């Protein structure tokens, strides 16, 4: 897909706004300050469609605004984690053929392996930063990290797969149009 700066700027703005709005829906987990987040499947979709820069900025800007609006302060390492998730998924966008109208079983498996790896890397950033900079207890942040990796991976696996499958179906497959 051709790089289109205006398109990417608009996608970043819309993506960050949706990240904030959807991020206001918090489904609590038993671990303090950790919840099931529904914005990451959408971030994965945007990362695959628009690439790593849009994916990073959507997560970074959206998470920063969400934290600022919540009144609990800005947790920069966790904000960075959101950006890194979008960046990593976006780096692998060329492995997917959603723009060609294809998101088949092998694509779904590949997507979910990539998003799980991206979640694992992204949600180690926050805890490491919390321990080193903020002096947070190691046991607490390890629990938060494990829960974040698992629940975010699960939501992206289910909802992200549905979103990418639906998006691929809106694209015209190459060679699918025939002259009558």
Swiss-Prot record:
Gene Ontology cellular-component annotations: plasma membrane
Subcellular location per the Swiss-Prot or TrEMBL entry: Cell membrane
Transmembrane region(s): 9-29, 45-65, 72-92, 113-133, 146-166
InterPro entries: ECF_substrate-spec-like, UPF0397
Keywords per UniProt: Cell membrane, Membrane, Transmembrane, Transmembrane helix
Main subcellular localisation: membrane
Membrane disposition: Multi-pass membrane protein
NCBIfam families (alphabetical): PRK13661.1
HAMAP family to which the protein is assigned, alphabetical: UPF0397 (MF_01572)
Xref: PANTHER family: UPF0397 PROTEIN BC_2624-RELATED (PTHR37815), UPF0397 PROTEIN SPR0429 (PTHR37815:SF3)
Family named by the database record: Belongs to the UPF0397 family.
Name of protein: UPF0397 protein SSA_0592
């Amino acid at each position: 897909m051709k790089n289109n700066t205006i398109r990417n700027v608009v996608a970043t703005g819309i993506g960050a706004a949706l990240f904030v709005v959807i991020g206001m829906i918090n489904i609590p987990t038993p671990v303090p300050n950790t919840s099931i987040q529904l914005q990451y499947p959408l971030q994965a979709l945007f990362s695959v469609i628009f690439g790593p820069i849009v994916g990073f900025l959507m997560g970074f800007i959206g998470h920063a605004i969400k934290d600022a609006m919540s009144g609990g302060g800005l947790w920069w390492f966790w904000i960075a984690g959101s950006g890194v998730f979008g960046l990593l998924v976006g780096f692998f966008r060329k492995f997917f053929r959603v723009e060609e109208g294809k998101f088949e079983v092998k694509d779904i498996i590949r997507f979910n392996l990539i998003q799980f790896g991206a979640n694992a890397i992204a949600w180690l950033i926050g805890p490491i930063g919390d321990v080193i900079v903020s002096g947070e207890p190691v046991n607490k942040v390890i629990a938060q990290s494990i829960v974040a990796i698992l629940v975010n991976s699960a939501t992206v696996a289910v909802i992200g797969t549905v979103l990418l499958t639906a998006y691929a179906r809106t694209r015209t497959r190459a060679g699918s149009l025939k002259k009558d």
